[in-house]
């Protein structure tokens, strides 16, 4: 039986990907959010829908993760950098044409937070501010699914694609030195065949495109002399492939 930790989470310290030490923050404040949502929904049939909405969120003390220099060490820790706002629109549609259907949704979010930064001016370090999106908030998120369903013949399947736009991955206390995660696409597929005796066979495939996850620092004065792999001029901090996965199975329903 595992022994529960008696060390508060806010005080723990350990390595994160062997790059930086992760450190808790006992001074972290809770996030308080004020939300305003406006939505219109229409359901022509039980299997069809149309939705369009607008939203506004005011976030006080949102919790973001960033890299902070303390003496000679750099720590990865949760912090409150200020107050933020999220404003956006979303659209969701699902429509069937006999055995074939389409389900799609798209969300645009304008995210904004102004934080204190440091910048080099010659040999001097000066304080400044910078307005940026909220940590982990992509401006564009979209999903599209092609659906296939035949109750008569016992077939059901879908091909689903998703896109997540560029977003902040780690916050730096230096101006224009944040680490970003590049936009990426994912494609999944599944199919299932049901039989009258309660048995069904299914197959699933995930991450068919195997799009790499790219983390980068945007090109600027601080990266001019960095000797590293680049993508569109940006310095690549990390590139990962998570691989494809496949599954075959059988189900039985009483």
Model feature map: region roles:
Residues 1-5, 44-46, 214:
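A surface-exposed, glycine/aromatic-enriched loop/edge motif typical of exported proteins
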């Amino acid at each position: 039986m595992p022994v529960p930790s008696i060390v508060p989470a806010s005080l723990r310290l350990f390595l994160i990907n062997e790059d930086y030490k992760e450190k808790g923050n006992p001074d972290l404040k809770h996030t308080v959010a004020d939300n305003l949502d406006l939505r219109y929904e229409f359901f022509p049939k039980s299997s069809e829908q149309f939705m369009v909405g607008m939203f506004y969120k005011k976030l006080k003390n949102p919790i973001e993760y960033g890299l902070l220099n303390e003496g000679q060490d750099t720590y990865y820790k949760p912090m409150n950098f200020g107050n933020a706002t999220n404003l956006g629109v979303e659209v969701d549609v699902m429509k069937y044409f006999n055995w074939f259907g389409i389900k799609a949704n798209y969300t645009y979010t304008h995210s904004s937070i102004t934080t204190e930064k440091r910048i080099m001016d010659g040999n001097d370090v000066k304080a400044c501010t910078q307005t940026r999106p909220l940590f982990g908030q992509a401006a564009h998120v979209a999903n599209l699914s092609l659906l296939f369903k035949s109750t008569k013949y016992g077939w059901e399947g879908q091909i689903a694609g998703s896109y997540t736009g560029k977003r902040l991955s780690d916050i730096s206390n230096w101006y224009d030195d944040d680490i970003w995660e590049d936009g990426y696409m994912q494609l999944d597929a599944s199919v299932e065949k049901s039989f009258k005796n309660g048995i069904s066979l299914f197959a699933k495939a995930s991450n068919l495109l195997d799009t790499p996850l790219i983390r980068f620092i945007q090109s600027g004065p601080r990266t001019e002399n960095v000797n590293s792999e680049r993508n569109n001029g940006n310095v690549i901090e990390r590139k990962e492939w998570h691989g494809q996965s496949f599954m075959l199975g059988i189900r039985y329903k009483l």
